[in-house]
Amino acid sequence: MESGDLRVFQMVAREGTITKAALQLGYVQSNVTARIQQLEAELGTTLFLRHNRGMTLSASGKLLLDYANKIIGLLDEASKALSSSAEPSGPLMIGCTQTTAAVRLPKLLASYYEEHPNVQLSLTTGHTQFLLDKVLRYELDGAFIGCECHHPELESYPAFEEEPVVVSAASVPDVEEAITKPILVYSTGCSYRETLEKWLRSVGVTQPVIMEFGTLEAIIGGVTAGLGISLLPRTVVQKHEAEGSIRLYPLPEALSQMKTEFIVRKDSFISSALRTFMDSFTPVKTAESQKSSLL
């Protein structure tokens, strides 16, 4: 069993089809198929269940994937450790939520790249649970997540604090009407969605109409058009409020701050590129929250 075969297996498991995996790897499909078949023959077990929609992991495949993630992660860490130098260089894969990418990251990344041009930065966005899983599978060097992290395999560092605010169209006159609207949110696993649903339950709305969106721009556009309400950082939407296109409602004090933390695996090697990146941000607090609360 070679590491290259495990990487092919890992990609097929992730993409769900030979075609997509081959495209991601830059291989021909027949090569990917042959390597999966060779791996199954070597291990004497079926790793994938084939069906019309693609391929899903068998019980043996799920077990192997856990080991493959660890082995590949350790090999990549060894490569980083051996090639690391005092001068930051090489790939640096960072993850963050879309709200963090919109407000906090542009200046931070631009400043970092200006100082360390030999680092190949890449940025992956997604909701908090997606990013946690990516870091745990060694697919990201680190990630900004929208909550406190207590996972036993992860180390977390405070990065930013945001003030979440309920956002509605400017035409919505008050919070009593706002809570009757659908909520526009990311998929399950988003900390802002969880906080919004928690607040709605506290004011008696237990089953809101939920509309899931894939991008921050789509959520803001839907809110502006009067489709529904959402919960977003004040720093993201204050420009829209100043333009008069939306209305903001502060949350009660107990929910008025959300922490953004930067997470890495505890067993990961911290390269010079990652260390200097982590040194480039410090805990930042937003302006003091308004004392008024909803309802």
Swiss-Prot record:
In this protein, which residues make up the domain named HTH lysR-type? Answer: 1-58
Enumerate the Pfam families for this protein. Answer: HTH_1 (PF00126), LysR_substrate (PF03466)
Keywords carried by this UniProt record: DNA-binding, Transcription, Transcription regulation
Q: Which residues bind DNA?
A: 18-37
UniProt-recorded Gene Ontology molecular function terms: DNA-binding transcription factor activity; transcription cis-regulatory region binding
Keyword Transcription assigned to the entry: answer is yes
Q: Which residues form the signal peptide?
A: none
For this protein, the record's InterPro entries field holds:
LysR_subst-bd, Tscrpt_reg_HTH_LysR, WH-like_DNA-bd_sf, WH_DNA-bd_sf
Has the keyword Transcription regulation been applied to this entry?
yes
Give the GO biological process terms.
regulation of DNA-templated transcription
Query: To which protein family does this belong?
Result: Belongs to the LysR transcriptional regulatory family.
> Would you tell me the protein name for this molecule?
Uncharacterized HTH-type transcriptional regulator YusT
Species name for this entry?
Answer: Bacillus subtilis (strain 168)
